[in-house]
């Protein structure tokens, strides 16, 4: 932390690169640095990949597989529990949410379409259009979350059910289609039967668990 503060005090743009196998306290770096790059354990070619991102030769498209907490007292942080209450001086939200990640370009979401499945295994299809509205080519990770609104047993408000990583040239649009099957919508009921219960389901499509761009509902 002393090194981060010292480098930041020079007034030069600062990028902090994390090589780690778990989440770390990133509060000071998030406050002082202009960018954070989490590389995890990138392997023997990791240096080349990190350099490509830092020098702008590649637009990053990684997404967090975990939530990054603000403090130890906030643990455990589960994205599926939704927004937690603030406590004393600590916010209820994580510092960086599950599924979060930045890019050197921007993407917009539009045209959510929900249709009943036409195949025996597909119960519901979810489609939307993603457009690269930035000034350079890049990849986006489109994430589909589902919430069971009327289940017989308590369910999380949102669960990641699918995602697609797509490459779009600047100005390009593409329709992304998800096929929801039994395993995507089934739950264990109070008698431990693995069933798909009829009822209302909430659909959420976005760029992260806390960055939902499109919402809709369907009924089984």
Specify the residue positions occupied by each region the protein language model found.
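Intrinsically disordered, low-complexity Pro/Gly/Ser/Thr-rich segments with frequent PxxP/GP/PP motifs
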Residues: 152-187
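Extended, hydrophobic alpha-helical segments in both membrane/secreted and soluble proteins
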Residues: 1-4, 14-16, 36, 50
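Short, hydrophobic/aromatic beta-strand segments
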Residues: 137-144, 156, 189-190
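Secreted, periplasmic, or luminal enzymes acting at the cell surface/secretory milieu
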Residues: 19-139, 145-147, 198, 202-205
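Terminal connector regions
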Residues: 181-220
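A short helix->loop->beta-strand "cap" motif at the edges of active sites that frequently abuts
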Residues: 9-14, 33
């Amino acid at each position: 932390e002393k090194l981060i503060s010292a480098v930041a005090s020079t007034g030069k743009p600062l990028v902090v690169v994390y090589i780690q196998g778990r989440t770390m306290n990133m509060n000071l770096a998030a406050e002082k640095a202009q960018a954070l790059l989490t590389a995890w354990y990138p392997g023997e070619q990791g240096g080349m990949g990190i350099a490509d991102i830092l020098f702008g030769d590649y637009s990053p498209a990684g997404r967090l597989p975990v939530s990054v907490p603000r403090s130890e007292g906030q643990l455990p942080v589960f994205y599926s529990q939704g927004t937690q209450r603030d406590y004393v001086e600590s916010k209820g939200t994580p510092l960086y949410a599950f599924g979060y990640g930045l890019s050197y370009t921007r993407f917009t979401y539009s045209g959510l379409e929900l249709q009943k499945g036409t195949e025996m295994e597909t119960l519901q299809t979810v489609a939307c259009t993603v457009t690269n509205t930035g000034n350079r080519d890049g990849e986006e990770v489109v994430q589909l979350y589902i919430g069971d609104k009327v289940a017989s047993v308590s369910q999380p408000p949102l669960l990641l059910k699918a995602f697609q990583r797509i490459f779009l040239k600047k100005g390009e649009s593409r329709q992304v289609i998800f096929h929801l099957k039994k395993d995507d919508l089934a739950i264990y009921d109070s008698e431990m039967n693995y069933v798909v219960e009829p009822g209302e389901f909430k659909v959420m499509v976005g760029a992260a668990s806390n960055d939902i761009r499109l919402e809709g509902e369907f009924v089984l």
